[in-house]
């Protein structure tokens, strides 16, 4: 009689552990899905920044070669506008670098979460309730 109670308790404890592990996997999966959505948004932002940076870099490259020493006042104006373009270029390139760094961090975090999920799935076997 005592043996059957102990065996029943052990089975219940195993079921509880399994359910807790499944709950952990579901929580990690939810976190992974949210991170993947954020990653896709950041990726779209990164693509947009890349296009903008390419345009601005080309514009800045052409602006730095347009100086003419024949008219001093125009040269000063050109230099000021070039400085402005270069600062804008620098800002966009910084944003792009930050976005790329953020994407890299997100990829690493997603890989860690996926590894945790895989590890937890090894511990438990999902059984269809039929």
What are these regions (language model features)?
Residues 1-5:
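Bacterial N-terminal signal peptides
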Residues 8-55:
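Immediate post-signal-peptide N-terminus of mature secreted/exported proteins
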Residues 10, 14-17, 21-24, 31, ...:
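Amphipathic, alpha-helical segments enriched in basic
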Residues 39, 46, 53, 60, ...:
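Leucine-rich amphipathic alpha-helices with coiled-coil/heptad-repeat character
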Residues 42-84:
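Extended alpha-helical coiled-coil "stalk/arm" regions
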Residues 74-130:
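Surface-exposed, polar helix/loop patches in the mature regions of secreted/periplasmic/lumenal proteins
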């Amino acid at each position: 009689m005592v043996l059957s109670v102990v065996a029943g308790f052990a089975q219940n404890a195993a079921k509880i552990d399994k359910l807790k592990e499944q709950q952990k996997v579901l929580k990690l999966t939810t976190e992974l899905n949210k991170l993947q959505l954020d990653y896709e948004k950041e990726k779209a932002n990164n693509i947009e920044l890349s296009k903008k940076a390419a345009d601005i870099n080309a514009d800045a490259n052409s602006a730095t070669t347009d100086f003419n020493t024949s008219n001093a006042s125009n040269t000063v104006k050109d230099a000021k506008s070039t400085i402005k373009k270069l600062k804008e270029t620098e800002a966009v390139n910084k944003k792009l670098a930050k976005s790329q760094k953020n994407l890299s961090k997100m990829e690493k975090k997603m890989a860690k979460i996926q590894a945790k999920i895989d590890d937890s799935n090894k511990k438990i076997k999902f059984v269809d309730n039929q």
